[in-house]
C-alpha cells in the first residue's frame, strides 16, 4: 500500500538554524515521537528505533534513513526503510524544502511517499495516513518548541 503525505510548517528561526536542527541527532531524538534510539553511523546513515502506535497495533520499528541531494540550507531528500517485525515493513522517502518567510523565519514544506506492507497495511489507508500526519505534526510542533527563541535570554541581555 502506498501512502502519500505532504505538509507545510512555519518555524520562527532562519533556514540555517532549521537545517542544522534537522541534521542534529540530539534534536531529532528529542523531537521524533516514540524515538527510543537514534544514532548517526560512520557511513552517514541515521539508524533509529521508534515505538509506534497505529490504531490497535503497537510496535517498535528499527529503521535506517539516508539524507541525499543535500543543498544546505535549502533542501534535501530523505530515503529510508523500517522493519516492524510481524507488524510489517515500510520503505519510502521525502523531499524537504526550506524557504525564508517575510518575518525572518522559515517555511518548511515536505512531500513524502511510503510503501507499507504486513499487518500495518491491513489497517487501511485512511487510518495510516491520518496517524502518519499526526506523527508529523507532533514532530514539527516539538521542533518548533525547541527552536523558539527563549524570552528569558533576550531579557537578561
Residue ranges and their predicted role:
Residues 1-45, 49-53, 103, 154-157:
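Hydrophobic ligand-binding cavity/cleft-lining segments
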Residues 2-8, 45-47, 60-62, 75, ...:
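Intrinsic-disorder/low-complexity, polar/charged segments enriched in Ser/Thr/Lys/Arg/Asp/Glu/Gln
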Residues 7-9, 35-36, 63-69, 92-100:
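Hydrophobic/aromatic beta-strand elements that line small-molecule binding cavities or substrate pockets
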Residues 10-14, 51-55, 68-70, 81, ...:
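Solvent-exposed residues in well-ordered beta-strands and their adjoining turns
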Residues 28, 34, 53, 57, ...:
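Glycine-rich, flexible loop/turn motifs
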Residues 39-82, 138:
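Glycine-rich portal/gate segments that line the openings of hydrophobic small-molecule binding cavities
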Residues 82-131:
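Beta-strand/loop substructures that line and gate deep hydrophobic ligand-binding cavities in soluble
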Residues 119-156:
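A conserved amphipathic terminal alpha-helix motif
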